[in-house]
Amino acid sequence: MLLWYFWIYSFLGYLLEKGFAKVTGAKLQGRKCFLLFPLCPVYGLGMLAVLVLPEALIRGVPGIIVCGVAATAVEYGVHWFYDAFLGVRFWDYSRVFGNLRGRICLQFSLIWGGLTAVVIRWIHPAVERLAERTVPEVTYLCLMVFALDAFCSLRLLKATGDPERLRADRG
């Protein structure tokens, strides 16, 4: 089920990024990190980090803080991986107040905390039901296609250093 959580939250993150860019009038830029699948893995990995925490840690106001810190740690790690190993940056907070090396910033750390609280309370129960209904054969097939997509995407990023090359729609 964790694999489906990753995929679903990565896809929802992609949709959120597209919506955020549209609402804020942000410069049109690519939001996905794979050639085929419209996924933002930082969202999927961030939610996995939150979901593996003990339930007692993720409830109430302290839980919002814990979840925000967990998701922010993932955001930092994902940014570091892309930068260190592939030479690409999908986001840069260096001009945002309270940033750390342009990888994370206070504003989005607070948003992570609130977003994870909303997801845990209202969205995750539906995601959990959906993941439980998926037959193993579909999971294996999706995993093979995803692994091929990830391999090709990582090679393209490493070769070009240009995340825009991943986008057929250029957006």
Label every model-predicted segment.
Residues 1-171:
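Aromatic-rich, lipid-facing transmembrane alpha helices and their immediate juxtamembrane interface loops
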